[in-house]
């Protein structure tokens, strides 16, 4: 992953955490070459992205802020091929499916700043992310949302977040094209992180 020096962005964040949901970490891997599995390779085959761009964003935030990382991992995994997953993901959304997680959800009572990352599926957050926000109260936190998308941007996700969390204040938001190269994604996202420290 890319190496980025610490910056003024880390100042003023207080106790911070990066919580994220990444597709490549929530798939059935039986019979797959695990080293080849990423949100990029699973979706599109080997190419210009070594890892999914959401993980690029997570890595850059961690390097520049020193925040604790907490990945959300579900017990019932998705299909490993992206196109096999998307129809089921729509059914999950329409039926308000309730996922369970491999680990207890994080205690953020002493956290000042939350960076939260996820993909955008069907113009919304994945259902496991919705389930997370149904259970963990973000009121009073400095909340920054980052995502990857395939043309929708953050669509109506911020409004959806506010429906799930009436006490939530979104301090900043950013969405990257999931199909960018890792290099261009890192350059673009770093520029956004720079703006947070100004």
Where are these regions (language model features)?
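Active-site-proximal alpha-helix that buttresses catalytic centers in soluble enzyme cores
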Residues: 6-198
């Amino acid at each position: 992953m890319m190496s980025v020096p610490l910056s003024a962005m880390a100042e003023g964040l207080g106790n911070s955490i990066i919580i994220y949901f990444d597709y490549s970490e929530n798939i059935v891997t039986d019979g797959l070459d695990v080293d080849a599995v990423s949100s990029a390779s699973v979706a599109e085959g080997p190419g210009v992205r070594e890892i999914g761009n959401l993980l690029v964003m997570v890595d850059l935030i961690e390097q520049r802020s020193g925040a604790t990382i907490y990945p959300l991992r579900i017990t019932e995994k998705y299909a490993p091929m992206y196109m096999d997953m998307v129809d089921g993901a729509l059914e999950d959304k329409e039926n308000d499916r309730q996922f369970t997680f491999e680990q207890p959800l994080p205690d953020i009572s002493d956290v000042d700043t939350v960076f939260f990352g996820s993909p955008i599926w069907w113009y919304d957050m994945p259902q496991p992310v919705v389930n997370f926000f149904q259970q963990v109260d973000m009121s009073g936190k400095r909340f920054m949302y980052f995502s990857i998308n395939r043309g929708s941007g953050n669509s109506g996700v911020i409004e959806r977040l506010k429906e799930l969390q009436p006490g939530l204040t979104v301090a900043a938001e950013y969405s990257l094209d999931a199909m960018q190269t890792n290099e261009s994604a890192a350059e673009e996202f770093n520029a956004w992180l720079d703006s947070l420290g100004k």
